[in-house]
Amino acid sequence: MIQRVQTIFLFLVAVAMLSVTALTIWEQVNPDQTEQMTLTAWNLTTFAMGEGAEGAVLEQKGVYYIGILAIVAAALALYSLSQFKNRTKQMFLNMINSLIMGITLGIAVFQTYQANQVFNPTAQGVFAFGFYAIVAAIIFNVVSNRFIRKDEMLVKSVDRIR
């Protein structure tokens, strides 16, 4: 049934993972306040800061695989949402989606670690909303799986009573 509570959580997974593609995941400013490095789902970009060079792109590296994984996770959540008649399949799809989101989170952390070592190893960058959207999506996925499992156990217990 579409009106179940896990539907809301699966929809929130899709929204959170799609927001990752539009939001900044990580950023860091060097100690001289002359450059800023930003990680999005599509690029790792170094910008110039200061007078006259504000916003000029100094270097850009494509990390499109984070964006692709985020879109795949959102699509899988929406597909899982449509599989409400087959709870076992829905739990399996959510398990696969958790794996994809975990890989996305791992790649994002790895990219931030690598960028931090190159850009400014003495200071840590700041994780932005895009990073926390991945974490929120994982939590929403776990909660939705819990409610799906609860429904499955309820159906099995009713079958036992018959």
Describe each PLM feature range.
Residues M1-F9:
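N-terminal membrane topogenic signal
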Residues F11-I25, I96-L105:
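Hydrophobic alpha-helical membrane-insertion segments
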Residues I8-L12, L69-I71, M95, L99, ...:
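Hydrophobic H-region at the start of alpha-helical membrane spans
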Residues A14-I68:
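Interfacial loop at the N-terminal end of multi-pass membrane proteins
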Residues T88-L99, V158-I161:
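Membrane-helix boundary/juxtamembrane motif in polytopic membrane proteins
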